[in-house]
Amino acid sequence: MYSVSNAWIKAHSGFLAPEGFVELSCYIPDLQETLVYTKSDLISFTHHQTGDLMSGELPKNYIEFSLDNSDGRWNPSNPKGLEQHLSERLRITLRYGFEINGTVSWIPGGVFYLSEWRTSLNGIAASFVARDVLEYCLDRPYTGSISGTLYDVAERAIGEAGILVDDTLGQFVLGESTLGGFVLGDGSPGTFKLCDALKRYSVENIEYDKNDSIAVILQKCANAAGCVMYQKRNGVFAIEKLRYTDTKYVIPMDLSYTYPEIEFMRPIKNVSVTYRDGKKLLYPFSGSGETQTLDNDFIATEAQAFEVAEWVCSNLRSRRNITGEFRSDTRLDLFDVVAVESKYGTISGVVLTDIKHTFTGAFRTTYSGYVRGSGVAVAVYCGEVFAGEVI
């Protein structure tokens, strides 16, 4: 969760909260100009983040928005229009604002790169999609070797994408590369940060699927080291251990549009880990339930497979997922640990794995999270719709 002032927290927690704001800025090299769009310019806006506690699926972080095109400024046939100056990977910076004591305070929302746009000749709106840096590693096949530590493999994969090491930052900087990489849009650097946990595990000369993309290689490294993948608000894409620090944040019923819904999944009886050369480890967890399977040839030894199985069980022991919708709080991030107020009590230890902020005249946030905490004494499925007006 992004840290803000006490005034921000106090203002947002009030039932009659001040107005929220969103701002998108994009530098256009052809024009040598930065285009800035605020809430008044947006017809619609969505910011969606998803992540997997097991790194079993690739994370996603993207924005979709539409702008007024009634004057034809985005028409492709307009010789003085803006569409001709668009190109893939233009850097778009997002920030969120909140009115406090008559002025707007801002916090970063993320860094994205233009991937799609649609500007019809006679349309009254132009729509755009921008995604995080990982998106540009999805269709680039990995051609290097799998040897050394997982850190070495991840570093090699990042290098193939054109990412250089900046030792002064301790991060990987995406820029011009002699390895056939690419530059993001305006030449601005994107950054990657790798956890030292990747240095604990070694892999040697593993045969892998030649169709595996750079993103998949990074995902396998994260999974084999018990790490998660996600992009931070400053544009840094991280592979690191999840610390599950409780933010002490509560999603209150007063600001919710619906009662939260709890989904119960079958408990885990054991975890089956398939590791290098097709070897298997069966890790018992409880007396009944289903078998959770994990297949990763980057897991090199039985000891490592045992650690991964323990990690899976510690994350998935609750087998409860919660979803809801409430008045937006743009401080919330992927993998934040929060509490959710329900009709019958407060559900604690909820790790957010899917969070979406939308604006179509007013802000809303929908969320999904995995319950790692004790939850409520009596778990109840609540499907009734809150009928009151939430401002």
Q: Model segments located where?
A:
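Acidic, low-complexity/disordered segments
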Residues: 1-13, 19, 128-130, 137-145, ...
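Detector for glycine-centered tight turns/loop "hinges" at secondary-structure junctions
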Residues: 31-32, 102, 234-235, 278, ...
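Short secondary-structure boundary/capping segments within folded domains
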Residues: 35, 52-58, 287-296, 302, ...
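Charged- and aromatic-enriched interaction segments used to assemble
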Residues: 103-106, 118-263
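Short beta-strands and strand-coil junctions in structured, solvent-facing domains, enriched
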Residues: 227-228, 309, 358
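Broad, structure-driven detector of short, well-ordered beta-strand segments within folded domains
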Residues: 228-231, 270-275
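Stable alpha-helical structural segments in soluble proteins, enriched in small hydrophobic residues
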Residues: 303-317
